[in-house]
Amino acid sequence: MNTDDTITIYDVAREAGVSMATVSRVVNGNKNVKENTRKKVLEVIDRLDYRPNAVARGLASKKTTTVGVVIPNIANAYFSILAKGIDDIATMYKYNIVLASSDEDDDKEVNVINTLFAKQVDGIIFMGHHLTEKIRAEFSRARTPVVLSGTVDLEHQLPSVNIDHSKAAQDAVALLAKHHDKIAFVSGPLIDDINGKVRLAGYKEGLKKKGLPFKEGLVFEAQYKYQEGYQLAQRVINSGATAAYVAEDELAAGLLNGLFAAGKKVPEDFEIITSNDSTIALYTRPNMTSISQPIYDLGAVAMRMLTKIMNKEELEEKEIVLNHGIRERGTTK
Protein backbone atom coordinates (compact mmCIF):
# COMPACT_ATOMS: atom_id res chain seq x y z
CA MET A 1 0.00 0.00 0.00
CA ASN A 2 1.16 3.57 -0.56
CA THR A 3 3.27 4.91 2.28
CA ASP A 4 2.43 8.56 1.54
CA ASP A 5 -0.80 10.24 2.61
CA THR A 6 -2.61 9.73 -0.69
CA ILE A 7 -4.87 6.70 -0.93
CA THR A 8 -5.47 5.72 -4.55
CA ILE A 9 -8.08 3.65 -6.35
CA TYR A 10 -5.37 0.98 -6.73
CA ASP A 11 -5.03 0.74 -2.93
CA VAL A 12 -8.78 0.31 -2.53
CA ALA A 13 -8.93 -2.33 -5.27
CA ARG A 14 -6.04 -4.36 -3.81
CA GLU A 15 -7.41 -4.18 -0.26
CA ALA A 16 -10.91 -5.20 -1.40
CA GLY A 17 -9.61 -7.91 -3.73
CA VAL A 18 -11.35 -6.49 -6.79
CA SER A 19 -10.35 -4.69 -9.97
CA MET A 20 -9.95 -0.92 -10.21
CA ALA A 21 -12.84 -0.95 -12.71
CA THR A 22 -15.09 -2.47 -10.04
CA VAL A 23 -14.11 0.23 -7.53
CA SER A 24 -14.85 2.86 -10.17
CA ARG A 25 -18.28 1.35 -10.85
CA VAL A 26 -19.11 1.38 -7.14
CA VAL A 27 -18.01 4.98 -6.67
CA ASN A 28 -19.96 6.11 -9.73
CA GLY A 29 -23.15 4.31 -8.72
CA ASN A 30 -23.14 1.73 -11.48
CA LYS A 31 -25.72 -0.94 -10.65
CA ASN A 32 -23.83 -3.71 -12.44
CA VAL A 33 -22.00 -4.71 -9.25
CA LYS A 34 -23.00 -7.54 -6.93
CA GLU A 35 -24.39 -6.32 -3.62
CA ASN A 36 -21.81 -8.13 -1.48
CA THR A 37 -18.99 -6.75 -3.66
CA ARG A 38 -20.40 -3.24 -3.46
CA LYS A 39 -20.61 -3.41 0.34
CA LYS A 40 -17.05 -4.74 0.59
CA VAL A 41 -15.69 -1.94 -1.60
CA LEU A 42 -17.59 0.71 0.35
CA GLU A 43 -16.22 -0.68 3.60
CA VAL A 44 -12.65 -0.47 2.32
CA ILE A 45 -13.23 3.05 0.98
CA ASP A 46 -14.44 4.10 4.41
CA ARG A 47 -11.65 2.35 6.27
CA LEU A 48 -8.87 3.75 4.10
CA ASP A 49 -10.52 7.17 3.87
CA TYR A 50 -10.22 7.12 0.10
CA ARG A 51 -11.08 10.59 -1.23
CA PRO A 52 -14.47 9.69 -2.74
CA ASN A 53 -15.58 8.25 0.61
CA ALA A 54 -18.17 10.99 1.03
CA VAL A 55 -19.61 10.04 -2.33
CA ALA A 56 -19.50 6.37 -1.41
CA ARG A 57 -21.42 6.95 1.79
CA GLY A 58 -23.81 9.01 -0.28
CA LEU A 59 -24.37 6.11 -2.62
CA ALA A 60 -25.30 3.95 0.34
CA SER A 61 -27.79 6.50 1.66
CA LYS A 62 -28.56 8.02 -1.75
CA LYS A 63 -27.54 11.41 -0.32
CA THR A 64 -24.26 13.33 -0.35
CA THR A 65 -25.55 16.28 1.76
CA THR A 66 -23.93 18.53 -0.82
CA VAL A 67 -25.63 21.29 -2.80
CA GLY A 68 -24.17 22.90 -5.91
CA VAL A 69 -24.54 26.66 -6.31
CA VAL A 70 -24.00 28.18 -9.75
CA ILE A 71 -23.06 31.86 -9.62
CA PRO A 72 -22.44 33.98 -12.75
CA ASN A 73 -19.86 36.30 -11.20
CA ILE A 74 -18.40 35.64 -7.78
CA ALA A 75 -17.15 39.25 -7.55
CA ASN A 76 -20.61 40.74 -8.15
CA ALA A 77 -21.96 42.23 -4.90
CA TYR A 78 -25.56 41.20 -5.64
CA PHE A 79 -24.78 37.52 -6.22
CA SER A 80 -22.31 37.32 -3.33
CA ILE A 81 -25.05 38.44 -0.91
CA LEU A 82 -27.42 35.88 -2.45
CA ALA A 83 -24.78 33.20 -1.94
CA LYS A 84 -24.41 34.19 1.71
CA GLY A 85 -28.14 33.62 2.25
CA ILE A 86 -27.89 30.22 0.58
CA ASP A 87 -24.86 29.20 2.63
CA ASP A 88 -26.37 30.18 5.98
CA ILE A 89 -29.51 28.10 5.45
CA ALA A 90 -27.48 25.22 4.02
CA THR A 91 -25.39 25.19 7.19
CA MET A 92 -28.54 25.27 9.32
CA TYR A 93 -29.82 22.15 7.56
CA LYS A 94 -26.36 20.51 7.58
CA TYR A 95 -25.67 20.69 3.85
CA ASN A 96 -22.30 21.50 2.35
CA ILE A 97 -22.03 23.99 -0.49
CA VAL A 98 -20.02 23.64 -3.69
CA LEU A 99 -19.84 27.13 -5.20
CA ALA A 100 -19.12 27.22 -8.93
CA SER A 101 -18.68 30.39 -11.00
CA SER A 102 -19.67 30.43 -14.66
CA ASP A 103 -17.90 33.77 -15.24
CA GLU A 104 -20.95 34.87 -17.27
CA ASP A 105 -19.94 32.45 -20.03
CA ASP A 106 -22.72 30.26 -21.48
CA ASP A 107 -20.45 27.35 -22.42
CA LYS A 108 -18.67 27.36 -19.08
CA GLU A 109 -22.08 27.46 -17.40
CA VAL A 110 -23.01 24.14 -19.03
CA ASN A 111 -19.67 22.61 -18.03
CA VAL A 112 -20.06 23.82 -14.46
CA ILE A 113 -23.52 22.28 -14.17
CA ASN A 114 -22.37 18.96 -15.61
CA THR A 115 -19.45 18.95 -13.17
CA LEU A 116 -21.87 19.42 -10.28
CA PHE A 117 -24.05 16.58 -11.58
CA ALA A 118 -20.93 14.39 -11.79
CA LYS A 119 -20.20 15.18 -8.15
CA GLN A 120 -23.65 13.75 -7.38
CA VAL A 121 -24.86 16.83 -5.54
CA ASP A 122 -28.28 16.42 -3.92
CA GLY A 123 -29.56 19.63 -5.48
CA ILE A 124 -28.57 22.77 -7.36
CA ILE A 125 -29.36 26.43 -6.83
CA PHE A 126 -28.90 28.36 -10.05
CA MET A 127 -28.17 32.07 -10.16
CA GLY A 128 -27.83 33.68 -13.56
CA HIS A 129 -28.95 36.49 -15.80
CA HIS A 130 -30.82 34.16 -18.13
CA LEU A 131 -31.68 30.52 -18.79
CA THR A 132 -30.29 29.34 -22.12
CA GLU A 133 -31.87 26.44 -23.99
CA LYS A 134 -28.75 24.38 -23.26
CA ILE A 135 -29.16 24.95 -19.54
CA ARG A 136 -32.86 24.09 -19.69
CA ALA A 137 -31.99 20.87 -21.52
CA GLU A 138 -29.42 19.90 -18.88
CA PHE A 139 -31.88 20.55 -16.06
CA SER A 140 -34.71 18.66 -17.76
CA ARG A 141 -32.53 15.57 -18.33
CA ALA A 142 -31.30 15.41 -14.76
CA ARG A 143 -33.14 13.99 -11.79
CA THR A 144 -31.34 16.40 -9.48
CA PRO A 145 -33.72 19.08 -8.14
CA VAL A 146 -33.01 22.67 -9.18
CA VAL A 147 -34.20 25.95 -7.68
CA LEU A 148 -33.63 29.36 -9.26
CA SER A 149 -32.56 32.27 -7.07
CA GLY A 150 -32.80 35.79 -8.45
CA THR A 151 -33.23 34.32 -11.94
CA VAL A 152 -36.19 34.85 -14.26
CA ASP A 153 -37.93 31.80 -15.78
CA LEU A 154 -40.46 33.01 -18.35
CA GLU A 155 -41.61 29.45 -19.02
CA HIS A 156 -42.38 28.86 -15.33
CA GLN A 157 -40.83 25.39 -15.40
CA LEU A 158 -38.56 25.54 -12.37
CA PRO A 159 -39.10 26.50 -8.72
CA SER A 160 -37.85 30.04 -8.17
CA VAL A 161 -37.48 32.92 -5.72
CA ASN A 162 -37.54 36.44 -7.08
CA ILE A 163 -39.03 39.90 -6.90
CA ASP A 164 -41.43 41.33 -9.47
CA HIS A 165 -38.84 43.03 -11.67
CA SER A 166 -41.45 44.38 -14.07
CA LYS A 167 -43.34 46.12 -11.26
CA ALA A 168 -40.04 47.36 -9.81
CA ALA A 169 -39.19 48.97 -13.16
CA GLN A 170 -42.61 50.63 -13.23
CA ASP A 171 -42.06 51.99 -9.73
CA ALA A 172 -38.67 53.41 -10.70
CA VAL A 173 -40.12 55.15 -13.76
CA ALA A 174 -43.00 56.54 -11.70
CA LEU A 175 -40.58 58.18 -9.26
CA LEU A 176 -38.39 59.63 -12.01
CA ALA A 177 -41.43 60.87 -13.95
CA LYS A 178 -42.20 63.34 -11.16
CA HIS A 179 -39.52 65.64 -12.55
CA HIS A 180 -38.63 64.24 -15.98
CA ASP A 181 -40.23 63.33 -19.29
CA LYS A 182 -37.12 61.84 -20.94
CA ILE A 183 -36.13 58.83 -18.87
CA ALA A 184 -33.45 56.46 -20.14
CA PHE A 185 -33.30 52.73 -19.47
CA VAL A 186 -29.66 51.71 -19.06
CA SER A 187 -29.87 47.94 -19.37
CA GLY A 188 -27.64 44.94 -19.13
CA PRO A 189 -27.57 42.67 -22.20
CA LEU A 190 -31.07 42.60 -23.68
CA ILE A 191 -30.64 38.92 -24.56
CA ASP A 192 -31.04 38.30 -20.84
CA ASP A 193 -34.74 37.72 -20.15
CA ILE A 194 -34.64 39.80 -17.00
CA ASN A 195 -33.66 42.81 -19.14
CA GLY A 196 -35.03 42.28 -22.64
CA LYS A 197 -38.36 40.81 -21.55
CA VAL A 198 -39.14 41.74 -17.95
CA ARG A 199 -37.48 45.05 -17.05
CA LEU A 200 -37.96 46.51 -20.51
CA ALA A 201 -41.67 45.64 -20.40
CA GLY A 202 -41.93 47.27 -16.98
CA TYR A 203 -40.10 50.36 -18.22
CA LYS A 204 -42.49 50.67 -21.17
CA GLU A 205 -45.54 50.15 -18.97
CA GLY A 206 -44.24 52.72 -16.49
CA LEU A 207 -43.88 55.30 -19.27
CA LYS A 208 -47.36 54.48 -20.57
CA LYS A 209 -48.94 54.96 -17.15
CA LYS A 210 -47.38 58.43 -16.96
CA GLY A 211 -48.43 59.36 -20.48
CA LEU A 212 -44.86 59.37 -21.76
CA PRO A 213 -43.87 57.93 -25.16
CA PHE A 214 -41.46 55.04 -25.47
CA LYS A 215 -38.40 55.90 -27.56
CA GLU A 216 -35.87 53.26 -28.60
CA GLY A 217 -33.18 55.93 -28.53
CA LEU A 218 -33.51 56.11 -24.76
CA VAL A 219 -32.68 52.41 -24.26
CA PHE A 220 -28.98 51.70 -23.79
CA GLU A 221 -27.47 48.21 -23.65
CA ALA A 222 -24.25 47.42 -21.80
CA GLN A 223 -22.40 44.71 -19.91
CA TYR A 224 -22.68 44.69 -16.12
CA LYS A 225 -19.46 46.63 -15.66
CA TYR A 226 -18.49 49.96 -14.14
CA GLN A 227 -16.44 51.03 -17.16
CA GLU A 228 -19.32 50.44 -19.56
CA GLY A 229 -21.58 52.69 -17.49
CA TYR A 230 -18.91 55.37 -17.39
CA GLN A 231 -18.44 55.24 -21.15
CA LEU A 232 -22.19 55.40 -21.76
CA ALA A 233 -22.61 58.69 -19.91
CA GLN A 234 -22.00 60.99 -22.86
CA ARG A 235 -24.34 59.01 -25.12
CA VAL A 236 -27.05 59.20 -22.48
CA ILE A 237 -26.56 62.96 -22.21
CA ASN A 238 -26.64 63.33 -26.00
CA SER A 239 -29.97 61.45 -26.12
CA GLY A 240 -31.60 64.28 -24.21
CA ALA A 241 -32.40 62.10 -21.20
CA THR A 242 -32.33 63.83 -17.82
CA ALA A 243 -32.92 60.70 -15.72
CA ALA A 244 -32.12 57.00 -15.92
CA TYR A 245 -33.36 53.72 -14.54
CA VAL A 246 -30.32 51.41 -14.47
CA ALA A 247 -30.42 47.61 -14.38
CA GLU A 248 -27.37 46.96 -12.18
CA ASP A 249 -25.49 48.78 -9.43
CA GLU A 250 -21.94 48.61 -10.81
CA LEU A 251 -23.24 49.86 -14.15
CA ALA A 252 -25.09 52.67 -12.37
CA ALA A 253 -21.98 53.69 -10.43
CA GLY A 254 -20.08 54.00 -13.70
CA LEU A 255 -22.85 56.10 -15.22
CA LEU A 256 -22.92 58.36 -12.15
CA ASN A 257 -19.20 59.09 -12.30
CA GLY A 258 -19.34 59.49 -16.07
CA LEU A 259 -22.02 62.15 -15.65
CA PHE A 260 -19.86 63.97 -13.11
CA ALA A 261 -16.91 63.83 -15.53
CA ALA A 262 -19.14 65.38 -18.21
CA GLY A 263 -20.01 68.27 -15.90
CA LYS A 264 -23.46 67.11 -14.81
CA LYS A 265 -24.65 67.45 -11.23
CA VAL A 266 -26.62 64.60 -9.67
CA PRO A 267 -29.46 64.92 -8.76
CA GLU A 268 -29.74 68.59 -9.80
CA ASP A 269 -29.16 67.98 -13.53
CA PHE A 270 -29.74 64.25 -13.75
CA GLU A 271 -31.46 61.64 -11.56
CA ILE A 272 -30.57 57.94 -11.27
CA ILE A 273 -32.34 54.92 -9.82
CA THR A 274 -30.45 51.63 -9.77
CA SER A 275 -31.84 48.12 -9.31
CA ASN A 276 -30.15 45.91 -6.73
CA ASP A 277 -29.46 48.00 -3.62
CA SER A 278 -26.19 46.18 -3.05
CA THR A 279 -23.38 47.71 -1.00
CA ILE A 280 -22.18 49.48 -4.16
CA ALA A 281 -25.16 51.85 -3.87
CA LEU A 282 -23.65 53.07 -0.59
CA TYR A 283 -20.10 53.44 -1.89
CA THR A 284 -20.90 56.20 -4.38
CA ARG A 285 -21.20 59.91 -3.67
CA PRO A 286 -23.99 60.68 -3.49
CA ASN A 287 -25.37 57.31 -2.37
CA MET A 288 -27.64 55.89 -5.06
CA THR A 289 -31.40 55.64 -4.88
CA SER A 290 -32.29 52.03 -5.60
CA ILE A 291 -35.02 49.49 -5.91
CA SER A 292 -34.67 47.66 -2.61
CA GLN A 293 -34.51 43.90 -2.80
CA PRO A 294 -34.26 41.41 0.07
CA ILE A 295 -31.16 39.98 -1.59
CA TYR A 296 -30.06 37.79 1.32
CA ASP A 297 -33.60 36.42 1.63
CA LEU A 298 -33.71 35.55 -2.08
CA GLY A 299 -30.86 33.14 -1.42
CA ALA A 300 -32.05 31.94 1.97
CA VAL A 301 -35.60 31.19 0.82
CA ALA A 302 -34.30 29.41 -2.30
CA MET A 303 -32.14 27.14 -0.15
CA ARG A 304 -35.03 26.37 2.19
CA MET A 305 -37.19 25.56 -0.83
CA LEU A 306 -34.50 23.20 -2.12
CA THR A 307 -34.28 21.39 1.24
CA LYS A 308 -38.01 20.73 1.05
CA ILE A 309 -37.74 19.32 -2.47
CA MET A 310 -34.75 17.15 -1.54
CA ASN A 311 -36.69 15.79 1.45
CA LYS A 312 -39.75 15.08 -0.70
CA GLU A 313 -41.83 17.70 1.11
CA GLU A 314 -44.66 19.44 -0.70
CA LEU A 315 -44.07 23.04 -1.80
CA GLU A 316 -46.83 25.49 -0.95
CA GLU A 317 -45.67 27.72 -3.81
CA LYS A 318 -43.46 26.84 -6.76
CA GLU A 319 -42.69 30.48 -7.58
CA ILE A 320 -42.10 32.76 -4.60
CA VAL A 321 -42.17 36.52 -5.18
CA LEU A 322 -40.70 38.60 -2.36
CA ASN A 323 -41.57 42.23 -1.72
CA HIS A 324 -39.52 45.10 -3.12
CA GLY A 325 -39.52 48.84 -2.55
CA ILE A 326 -37.52 51.93 -3.41
CA ARG A 327 -34.87 53.26 -1.05
CA GLU A 328 -34.47 56.94 -1.82
CA ARG A 329 -31.00 58.38 -1.42
CA GLY A 330 -28.93 61.12 -3.00
CA THR A 331 -29.33 60.46 -6.74
CA THR A 332 -32.99 61.51 -6.76
CA LYS A 333 -34.58 64.78 -5.62
UniProtKB/Swiss-Prot annotation:
DNA-binding region listed in the record: 9-28
SUPFAM superfamilies: lambda repressor-like DNA-binding domains, Periplasmic binding protein-like I
Keyword annotations of the record: Activator, DNA-binding, Repressor, Transcription, Transcription regulation
One Pfam family linked to the record: Peripla_BP_3
Span of domain HTH lacI-type: 7-61
InterPro entries noted in UniProt: CcpA, HTH_LacI, LacI/GalR-like_sensor, Lambda_DNA-bd_dom_sf, Peripla_BP_I
GO-annotated molecular function: DNA-binding transcription factor activity; transcription cis-regulatory region binding
SMART domains: HTH_LACI
Entries under PANTHER family matching the protein: ARABINOSE METABOLISM TRANSCRIPTIONAL REPRESSOR, LACI-RELATED TRANSCRIPTIONAL REPRESSOR
Protein task: Global transcriptional regulator of carbon catabolite repression (CCR) and carbon catabolite activation (CCA), which ensures optimal energy usage under diverse conditions.
UniProt protein name: Catabolite control protein A
Organism: Streptococcus mutans serotype c (strain ATCC 700610 / UA159)
Gene name for this UniProt entry: ccpA
